[in-house]
Amino acid sequence: RTTTVTIYESGDIMLCKVAATGEISWIQTLPKKQREKLVQHYGYSVTSGWGPGMRFFSTSEMPYHSGFGAVKSGQNINIFMNDNPKNATVTKAGQQVRTASAITKSDCFMISVDEKTGALTRNQIFSNKDIPTAMPKSMVTIGNDVYMVGRSDKNVWKNRIAVGRITLK
C-alpha cells in the first residue's frame, strides 16, 4: 500500500486596471493564504464497483476548496473564496493574514472590487462549518445568479454534496 500526500498552496491575488492606452489606472493586492491537503491511498482491493477508491470529483480538479471564483456585476468584480474567519477585515497588502488550512472550518467570503477605483470590500457570505464546504473556483454564473457546489468528505460512504445560489444585485 502506498500513500501520497499533495499540498496545494494558494497565495495573494493581484488585481489591476489597465486603460486602453496601456496605462495602469490602479493596482491592488488581495492578501490570501490557503492550504489544502489531499491524501491518497493506493493498494489492492477485493471489491468492485463504486467504493472508496472511486471519485465523483476528479483529482485533476484539485484543489477543490481553495482558489477563487470571480464574476462581474454592475461596476464591481466580485471574488468568491474560502478563508480563515479571522481574515474578515483583511483587504490591503501588509495586513496580517491567517492561513486557511482547516478548510471545513472556513468562511466563504465575497470580496467586491470597485472597477473604477480598485477599492476592496469584504463580506462573509456563510460559514462552511456545518455544511458541505464551498468550491468557489467551480462556480457557474447564469444572469445575476451564482451557483456554487459544496462538498463534504467526512466519511467515505456518506459524502455530501450541496448546490447553493447567490443572487447579485
Language-model-derived ranges and their functions:
Residues 1-169:
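Secretory-pathway ectodomains
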